[in-house]
C-alpha cells in the first residue's frame, strides 16, 4: 500500500470501530498505523508473543526494540 492508502485504511478502520462499536483484530506490519489507531498491541517475534500493552508501552519495551530494531533503548 502507498502512504495515502495506509492513511485511508487507518481512517476506515477507526470509522468502522467508532460507528459500530467494534473490537477489531488487526494483523499489520505498518507500525506507525498500528501505533496510531490501536488501544492495545501484541508484539510477536517468530510466532511468539514478546510484549503486550498500550502503544507507548510497546514502543519502549526492551524485547520489542531488540526484536524489531536490533538494539537497546
What is the role of each PLM region?
Residues 1-73:
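Glycine-rich phosphate-binding loops of nucleotide-dependent enzymes
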Amino acid at each position: 500500500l502507498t502512504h495515502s492508502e495506509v492513511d485511508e485504511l487507518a481512517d476506515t478502520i477507526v470509522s468502522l470501530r467508532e460507528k459500530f462499536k467494534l473490537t477489531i483484530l488487526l494483523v499489520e506490519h505498518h507500525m506507525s498505523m498500528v501505533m496510531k489507531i490501536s488501544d492495545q498491541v501484541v508484539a510477536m517475534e517468530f510466532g511468539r508473543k514478546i510484549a503486550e500493552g498500550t502503544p507507548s508501552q510497546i514502543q519502549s519495551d526492551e524485547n520489542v526494540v531488540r526484536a524489531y530494531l536490533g538494539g537497546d533503548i
